[in-house]
Amino acid sequence: MTKEIIKQKIRKAVEENPYKKDFRKVSLFGSYAHGKPKKNSDIDILIEFQPASKIGFFALARIQRDLEKKVGSKIDLLTPNSLSDFLKQEILQNAEKIYEKR
């Protein structure tokens, strides 16, 4: 799949997700964002939630499963707090926004 097709599928999956009201921003990073995915690459997605959101581990797992089902690929779903300090700044600066709550 091309990067644009992946972004379209993610955008559609986000729009249909029951937790959408809690999403602040959803971005693509990693090999697909750089246009260099390998055959077995997963899709790296950074999700930022509204400040008042109470999304826990199980809800995050449901969001990930829903995205995987609708996109048709393995998803690595991360939040800014789950990023390693070593890579955090680079990922936050270079991630490609797919969805942002208006």
Q: Where are the regions a protein language model picked out?
A:
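Catalytic core of pol beta-like nucleotidyltransferases
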Residues: M1-K25, H34-K39, Q50-R102
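Glycine-rich beta-strand-to-loop/alpha-helix junction loops that act as flexible
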Residues: F29-S31
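Short, conserved active-site loops that position catalytic residues or coordinate cofactors/metal ions
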Residues: S41-I43
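Short hydrophobic/aromatic beta-strand micro-patches
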Residues: L46-E48
